[in-house]
């Protein structure tokens, strides 16, 4: 089992936010949910030099457990952001 992070981009049309409760409960029932949150404002820092601007197009994340990238992709079913046409970026979180 590997850990993956789903990043929601700020490009979804308006959708019913009430769908999140059902989606997150489904992930929990399947044993896939590892956490998540909306992403607020912040800053980028770099020692000794100016840093780039923050990544503003990321608005939320969910951490999941899945056996493969294909399984992680299948867990997007019912994700309100994805179902509304928004972009979801899936990244594996390597174990070190």
Predicted regions and their residues:
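Conserved, structured core segments of small domains
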Residues: 1-96
């Amino acid at each position: 089992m590997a850990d993956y992070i789903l990043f929601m981009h700020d490009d979804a049309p308006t959708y019913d936010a009430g769908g999140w409760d059902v989606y997150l409960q489904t992930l929990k029932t399947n044993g896939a949910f590892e956490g998540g949150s909306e992403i607020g404002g912040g800053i980028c820092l770099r020692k000794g030099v100016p840093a780039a601007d923050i990544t503003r197009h990321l608005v939320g994340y969910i951490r999941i457990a899945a056996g493969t990238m294909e399984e992680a992709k299948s867990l997007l079913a019912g994700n309100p952001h994805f179902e509304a046409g928004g972009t979801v970026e899936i990244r594996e979180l390597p174990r070190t």
